[in-house]
Design a protein with these regions (language model features):
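Short beta-strand-to-turn element immediately C-terminal to the catalytic PLP-Schiff-base lysine
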Residues: 131-135, 189-192, 224-226
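Conserved catalytic alpha/beta cores of large enzymes that bind or transform nucleotide phosphates
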Residues: 200-261
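N-terminal beta-alpha lobe that positions the nucleotide/phosphoryl donor
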Residues: 1-175, 184, 255-258
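Short, flexible loop/turn elements at secondary-structure junctions
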Residues: 114, 178-180, 207
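Short conserved micro-motifs at the rims of enzyme active sites and ligand-binding pockets
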Residues: 121-122, 187, 213-215
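Short, glycine/charged-enriched secondary-structure capping and boundary segments
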Residues: 123-125, 190, 203
Length: 261
């Protein structure tokens, strides 16, 4: 129910979700990846089973049929049940062992990794929640539970509904990964995402933690790179804020004028 990155490969999406499978593959390729582990989809299923939520989800989805409003109403109930659920002792112990192996009271990111991410015909990335700068077992378990609940947010459910994805098939893993105190962060697309140009890469970057870029909260800088020539097109965004560490997670702060452009 809990796996090290090195034991996961890119084909293991059903076990580790999209992000988890990619982190595992990068680790196997000796790429420098911040340390961590994956609470697998089996752990999510066991959590649902122990808290008697599995049958509730199946029954309510069957009742809702293909009516979006009914599915959303059911999902609201699923979230409440998940948030009030408890972790089985064996799973809690496994998570605790892996967390302690990272170092004493390490600050970590708790990252959702759903099985419906990065499909060929739809992008589910960003539909589930992730949390930064989390510390201590109680907080980790609380935020894993929040990741589980985020599988059933209105946004995630509606997106799956409109993509024609079977709600009963979706599952989620959670990544627990050591935090990196980044002054600047970004996202790299190895294929230009708008025009699907395989000869170009796109980087979106901003100051602070990557949450501001991923969430679209800031107008990030963009760098378009031609793979063949190395030529770069740069567009500097008006970055008004940045997300940085806080004692209890993260906080959004105004960026100084000299860094905005």
């Amino acid at each position: 129910m809990v796996a090290d990155f090195k034991d996961i490969k890119k084909e293991d999406v059903s076990v580790a979700g999209g992000k988890g499978a990619n982190l595992g593959e990068m680790t196997r390729e000796k790429i420098n990846v911040p340390a961590g582990f994956i609470v697998t989809t089996e752990a999510y299923k066991e959590f649902l089973r122990v808290n008697k939520i599995t049958d509730i989800i199946n029954n309510e989805l069957n009742k809702a049929g293909n009516d979006e409003k009914s599915i959303l109403n059911a999902a609201c109930y699923f979230r409440k049940r998940i948030r009030s659920g408890t972790f089985p002792a064996a799973l809690k112990n496994l998570i605790g062992e892996k967390y302690n192996a990272l170092g004493e009271n390490k600050k970590v990111a708790i990252r959702s990794s759903a099985t419906a991410e990065d499909l060929a015909d739809a992008s589910f990335a960003g539909q589930q929640d992730s949390y930064l700068n989390i510390q201590g077992m109680d907080e980790i378990l609380e935020h894993i539970r929040s990741c589980y609940a985020s599988l059933w947010t209105d946004r995630a459910v509606s997106y799956r509904f409109r993509q024609g994805y079977d709600q009963s098939r979706v599952s989620i893993a959670v990544i627990v990964q050591e935090m990196v105190e980044s002054e600047k962060s970004g996202v790299l697309f190895t294929v230009a995402p708008i025009n699907k140009n395989e000869n170009a890469m796109l980087i979106n970057a901003a100051f602070g933690l990557g949450e501001s870029v991923v969430s679209g909260r800031v107008s990030a800088d963009t760098y378009m790179i031609d793979k063949k020539t190395g030529m770069i097109q740069i567009n500097i965004g008006n970055k008004e804020t940045q997300i940085v560490y806080d004692k209890k997670g993260t906080v959004e702060r105004v960026l100084s004028d000299d860094k905005r452009k």
